A protein has these predicted regions:
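Short glycine/serine- and acidic-residue-enriched loop/turn motifs that recur at repeat junctions
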Residues: 18-46, 87-109, 147-169
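Structural signature of WD-repeat beta-propellers
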Residues: 2, 10, 36, 71-72, ...
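Structural signature of eukaryotic scaffold interfaces centered on beta-propeller domains
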Residues: 1, 57-70, 124-131
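Conserved core positions of repeat-based scaffolds
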Residues: 4-8, 17, 61, 74-77, ...
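Beta-rich catalytic cores
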Residues: 2-3, 71-72, 102, 120, ...
Length: 169
């Protein structure tokens, strides 16, 4: 969960959220963004229709897979077809979209320009700093390479990147 919302994936691969959703982290195009506490779950959408075919958890420790990650106010997840999606506040560009714009619905995260290239994503994870106003996400490729976006300490001396950046093998 983020600071404000909880999430669940149903058996049929639909993603639901509930909670306060002040910063777009409801992923429902704003229908939950009415302030206060939303105790009824809402379907996460892509802006016009509900998201389906979300890869189901069933985290397999031997394969080291994680398919949904949360940070302070953003969410990153994988679909069954291997595509990466995210939504939320996007603090410091943590979603890896190349910008810091908030999005209140799920959008595909383009990783085609990442170098070295990623053939498929094995897992995702989220990180929150001690002050909760900095967040980052990581991708682990099927080749076991680590890529990070958002607030972090990068090998080139930068502390924030808005696109996924290769870190290590």
């Amino acid at each position: 969960s983020t600071n404000y919302n909880g999430y669940a994936v149903t058996k049929d691969g639909k993603l639901w959220s509930w909670g306060m959703s002040y910063t777009g982290d409801g992923g429902d195009s704003g229908s939950l963004s009415r302030g206060g506490s939303n105790t009824s779950p809402g379907k996460v959408t892509d802006g016009s229709s509900e998201i389906s075919n979300v890869k189901r958890w069933g985290i397999d420790c031997k394969r080291n897979e994680n398919v949904l990650a949360c940070a302070t106010a953003s969410v990153l997840f994988l679909l069954q077809n291997g595509k990466l999606y995210g939504f939320g506040r996007n603090i410091s560009g943590a979603l890896g979209r190349g910008n810091t714009s908030t999005t209140s619905y799920a959008i595909e995260i383009n990783i085609s320009s990442v170098t070295p290239s990623i053939s498929s994503i094995k897992g995702v994870f989220g990180n929150v700093s001690h002050n909760q106003y900095k967040e980052s996400f990581g991708i682990i490729s099927s080749e076991n390479k680590l890529y990070i976006s958002g607030d972090n300490y990068y090998p080139d001396g930068n502390t924030s990147k808005t696109s996924f950046t290769f870190i290590l093998d």
